[in-house]
Amino acid sequence: MTGGVERVFLNIVSNITDKKVLILPIHQKYDDNLIKELPENVSIIKNDKYSLKGFLSVFDLIRLANYINKKVINNFEEFCVINFSDTISTIIVSCLIKAKRYLSWCHCNPSAYLGSKFFFLYKIFFKKFENIVCICDTQKKEFCKVFGDSYSEKIIICFNLTDLKKIDNLKNEILNFNKEYILMVARFDNRSKDFYTLIDAYKKLDAHLKEKYSLVFVGDGEDFEKIKQYAVLSGEYNHIVFTGLQKNPYKWMKNAKLFVLSSKTEGFPLVICEALATECPVISSDCISGPRDILMDGKYGLLFKVGDSDSLSKKMTLLLSDEKIYNNYVSTARKRIEEINSYAIASINKIFLK
């Protein structure tokens, strides 16, 4: 278990402690810190013998499903299978397990399925699920574009929950960083994130703003060195800070002047919600999907066109220069996340009380 999807899962199961939840990991890669946070109602099904360690094998998936059917589900009167990943392997296994009810969560931009060599399999297996859970309205529209309008009535909208208690416990830790800064927290992956546009936008800020505000990147990933080199070539490296992966990103959000998410594609970027929860104003690329749904088309944060560094630079300048507009976004940030959480909990109850 690693990454944002697993964090979303943890937030959900922490709100359904009256249900027995079994996790079936397909690949044996865990984040030990997340495992330690699992509530008592959650257990991990050990499947070392059948777990996938490399190339997708249909036979492995069939054997794994048969193992679950013979050894696990007989212990329960009612068994609901929820696919909580966007990979074809987890979808196939979910459909092969015998259950009373089948659901599948969609975390990604649905157009990503079109680029998969397994797209024909997605089309076949998605038909078996009673409900598809999308994490915002924009994602639902995209899913129906890709797989057909017939899915519209099967789709349940469930926003991702933000763990406000955890954020509140961590955001006030002392941060040993003495300069004001603009922040982006993300995995260094150029396929979905757009660090270059943010660096270009920062370069276009007036000199006095760059002198006052550093640009800070929190995170790590396979493209870290490429992005760092781009920062060097931009001529702004002296104003840009790469912190690497941080155990507590919330104290960085709490102390940031503003938070920027520059992405090419998203599902439902929880990092925007986390920044808003610390009352940090947000600017995000208007990518599919999530940012527009969270920020309500500018009501709770500013949006810019994907890849448009001029627009981003102007909106950064606006927030850094206009105190009235800036303070308005500060005052409404937390309220928006509490509202989203309220919607999410209502949806979770609807899903799991069926």
Named regions from a protein language model:
Residues 324-353:
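A charged, aromatic-enriched C-terminal amphipathic alpha-helix characteristic of glycosyltransferases
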Residues 296-298, 302-309, 318-323:
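Conserved acidic donor-binding segment of nucleotide-sugar-dependent glycosyltransferases
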Residues 3-11, 180, 184, 189-204, ...:
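A conserved mid-protein helix/loop that constitutes part of the nucleotide-sugar donor-binding site
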Residues 1-3, 7-11, 15, 19-59, ...:
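N-terminal strand-loop element at the rim of the active site
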Residues 245, 264:
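Aromatic "clamp/platform" in nucleotide-sugar-dependent glycosyltransferases that forms part
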